[in-house]
């Protein structure tokens, strides 16, 4: 990889002309979102996340490797470095960090006025909206 975010690369003006993207956002009640995050983290642990990270560490991966900096991996490196976190503590830290990441994403997209927000349970409404607004090139 280049180490640079995609947004740092120039986009020719000819590509931007006539582009009006259709942006759809999915929104949930905060309590529901947080409960889903908690369930997802529990499932990740049930499916062997701790063993996966342990094997990666044994294979020589470190917290400096890009793939190990993501939520769900870096917390294990913190546990090893600090030595004071338990597996339960790591799990709670992953939940907290995921909730914070979700909040940042929501904040980012809320500042984009062209986002059309829907509840994920309204799939028929979303499909109709897309069909009514999709322009085939």
Predicted segment positions?
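Phosphate/pyrophosphate-binding catalytic cores of soluble transferases and nucleic-acid-acting enzymes
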Residues: 1-137
